[in-house]
Amino acid sequence: MIFFTITGSLTAAIVYDRRERRRVQQKWCDLVAHLSKETLPIEQTRRKLTIFLSAPPGDGLRIAREHFKEYVKPILVAAALDYTVIEGRREGDVRAALAERIRKHRRKAGEPSSVVEEMSNEDIIADARQKIGVVEEPGPKGDLVIGRHTWKEYIRGLHEGWLGPLDPPSPPDAPVKGPSVPVEGSETPADGTPAEENTEKKEEAEKKDDKPAKPSGPTPAYVSPAEYSSRSLPPTLPQSLDSSVPIPFPHLLGFLNTPIRLYRYLSRRHLADEIGREVAGLVLASSSRPYHDGSFSSDSELSGAMVDAGASTLSSPDDMMPSSSAKYEQQTVLEKEESEWHKSVHKRDEENPDKEREWIDDIVLDPRIASRMQRSLLSADEEARSQRITEGKEYILGEERPAPVSFWQRMWIKYGYGEDEETIRMKPIIGNLDGADGE
């Protein structure tokens, strides 16, 4: 009896959570589904978002991909939006990729640089589209950042790309070793090996040097956080950057944390609701606000009109110099996730303790960049409409809610030989091919 009680309770909790999670996700999908019905001119491509994700501390990239596919991708598919994914397998990959992307944009805008870029597949496709007159759909874009660790790399890469130089810094000088002095009166060098063997080893070393060496890590940063205040803003920096949305990515490891992990597994509907609201706000792009700094309270909300008004005042590169006492909202976003990271992540490299660590170092912001960042929000009207969708009073914009389907009919359609009305409607109607007399 005890066994059946525990098993039945656990099964009921799992089934209930999955059903509620599907219902919550369907609400946010219905909220943005009207965008997929909009038609575009033949010379325009769909609006594209940028997804930033990286392997969580202490785990692999597959976990981050599953988190994206489970909570974020269904809403993007419902809105029929295009997206680009920037992935990072190691610490610093997202930072390096974003910084290089911004530097590439600055070079294309006309800023002088001695770097000769190679044509990538994306450049070839973009050049072909430009020749035939295909342009992107006008409208606001956005960046969706998954997890606190990715968010810290995103902030670092944003500053490095806009404040750093376009040309890579010169590598540090390697220590010069003195030549070995051979012993007089002997035919072998000082190491005791014959001269022929040394010659063969040198030839093998030269062959190895000819092969391109694999990078041992991400590209080193072009500028350090301590140099932010001394760098001038590039002329191609816009008055306001694309909107960004940090997405929570709780990832707790360890056997002793099993009760917490079990509770989170049985209450994933709340996480789906929170992520769905943030993603829907970025997809609809109906409202945005600048991130708060030390002068704003956490409860204050600024409208999208104040974004342009605040950004227009930053016309000089020397405006708003860094203040050590300022506390920005970007520094506290998803801060609770850091306490759940594996303890091995917080260890410094004993051989190189001064090495930069994007995940464990404090977030350093330059006010000139931080004030240009915006955060997408779900407007009050869209929030009210999502509530009406939950209550069944409203459906996708421009459509009526279909008639409810019974449980048994739904099972017959899903697992049996039944067909829903939409599938039947899409079937071609073939007339009598044998003629009127049936021959």
From Swiss-Prot:
Localization of this protein: Mitochondrion inner membrane
GO CC annotations, alphabetized: cytoplasm; intracellular membrane-bounded organelle; membrane; mitochondrial inner membrane
Mitochondrial matrix-facing ranges: 1-70
Feature: compositional bias, Polar residues: 227-239
Pfam short name (any one): Tim54
GO biological process: protein transport
Compositionally skewed regions (Basic and acidic residues) per UniProt: 198-213
Residue runs in coiled coils: none
Bias type Low complexity, positions: 315-325
Membrane topology classification: Single-pass membrane protein
Mitochondrial intermembrane side: 88-439
Swiss-Prot/TrEMBL keywords: Membrane, Mitochondrion, Mitochondrion inner membrane, Protein transport, Translocation, Transmembrane, Transmembrane helix, Transport
Function: Essential component of the TIM22 complex, a complex that mediates the import and insertion of multi-pass transmembrane proteins into the mitochondrial inner membrane. The TIM22 complex forms a twin-pore translocase that uses the membrane potential as external driving force.
Family: Belongs to the TIM54 family.
Oligomer and partners: Component of the TIM22 complex, whose core is composed of TIM22 and TIM54, associated with the 70 kDa heterohexamer composed of TIM9 and TIM10 (or TIM8 and TIM13).
Identification of the protein by name: Mitochondrial import inner membrane translocase subunit tim54
Organism: Aspergillus fumigatus (strain ATCC MYA-4609 / CBS 101355 / FGSC A1100 / Af293)
